[in-house]
Regions:
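Signature of WW domains and closely related Tyr/Trp-rich beta-sheet microdomains
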Residues: 2, 29-108
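Intrinsically disordered, low-complexity regulatory regions of plant transcription factors
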Residues: 1-39
Length: 108
């Protein structure tokens, strides 16, 4: 084993699978996420990014992203990111952050 590597080596590939119609604001958020990301991924993990143009994510504000992280076992983890790249683990956390900022989400 080389120096600086752990026995449980992680995949340092932090690339995302993106839809074709991602907005410029969403791409900027991706850059911020990559800048903040320090840990690699478990081998076999795939990351799909969604923005407010994707089905089921129309509730997100422009620049906010949802990540669907599929691990080797097939389990899907959802995470959310604000435009600065900050991670939110649940939709409730996102809505709470918006409420603290004075924003209100109205269901249509």
């Amino acid at each position: 084993m080389e120096r600086g590597q752990s026995s449980n080596q992680r995949n340092n590939n932090n690339e995302f699978i993106l839809p074709d119609n991602f907005s410029e604001l969403s791409l900027k958020t991706i850059e911020n996420i990559q800048r903040r990301c320090r840990k690699g991924l478990e081998p076999g993990t795939v990351r799909y990014m969604r923005d407010n143009r994707c089905p089921g994510y129309g509730w997100l504000l422009p620049g906010w992203l949802a990540e669907e992280r599929v691990v080797a076992s097939g389990r899907v983890y959802k995470h959310y990111y604000d435009p600065s790249g900050r991670l939110y683990r649940t939709q409730f956390e996102v809505l709470y952050a918006w409420e603290k900022a004075g924003l209100i989400l109205l269901d249509s």
